[in-house]
Amino acid sequence: MSEAAELPPVPEQARDVFGDRYADAVRYAELLAEAGVKRGLIGPREVPRLWERHLLNCAVLSEVVPEGVTVCDVGSGAGLPGIPLALVREDLKITLLEPLLRRTNFLTEVVELLGLDHVTVVRGRAEEVMGKLPPVHVVTARAVAPLDRLATWGIPLLRPYGEMLALKGDTAEEELKAATAALSKLGAEQTSILHVGEGVVSPLSTVVRVEVGESPGGVRFAAKRAKAARTGRTRRRRG
């Protein structure tokens, strides 16, 4: 590894957080520092803070993800938060959704190399796959878009009474306030700001949780989902 991409020492907390998958987490960090930088998936300046700012920051999201649910990581990029979440939670079924080919190629390589059998990589935009992918219990996202825009992509992918978990920074409260009207139209019934990672990361990771009701995405998307379901049933009968 070049000096410019020198990884920092692995924090002691990583062993506790990743457990049996600790070695895989280390390998993932190495892949980000090497192939991730070469392919332009992360900037070289991020390498010295890969553990604190990226891997651990994302892994602690697991604290607020229910057990045994389906997850779609929207705009997964280099796999953050999807891959750290997958490493600490093998009870989840995770889809990494990413539109760019060079990123999905990297994600596929990582998933295969680390043996993440509970993870699927899908190339596409959220608005393109709605109705094609099964609705999920949880949508995750990090550094994708402001909350109001992110919600228009993420919420329609949810099952009824699902939730979107967006990792945000200092702007979380401001973004949530600005997105109130948009979230309401999309079927959001409850919102909250959570702080996770006590004893693992400092500052704590900030998560905006958006819980939806019976019609995630609102009436417009409920109609689209119903049409997609009817089309799917027709195709199965013909098959």
UniProtKB/Swiss-Prot annotation:
S-adenosyl-L-methionine binds at residues 75, 80, 126-127, 142. Its EC number is 2.1.1.-. GO terms for cellular component: cytosol. It is an enzyme of class 2 (transferase). Pfam families: GidB. Disruption phenotype: Confers low-level streptomycin resistance and a greater ability to produce the antibiotic actinorhodin. Disulfide bonds: none annotated. GO terms for molecular function: rRNA (guanine-N7-)-methyltransferase activity. It comes from the Bacteria. Keywords: Cytoplasm, Methyltransferase, rRNA processing, S-adenosyl-L-methionine, Transferase. It is found in: Cytoplasm. InterPro entries: rRNA_ssu_MeTfrase_G, SAM-dependent_MTases_sf. The keyword Protein biosynthesis does not apply. Belongs to the methyltransferase superfamily. RNA methyltransferase RsmG family. Specifically methylates the N7 position of guanine in position 518 of 16S rRNA. This is Ribosomal RNA small subunit methyltransferase G. It comes from Streptomyces coelicolor (strain ATCC BAA-471 / A3(2) / M145).
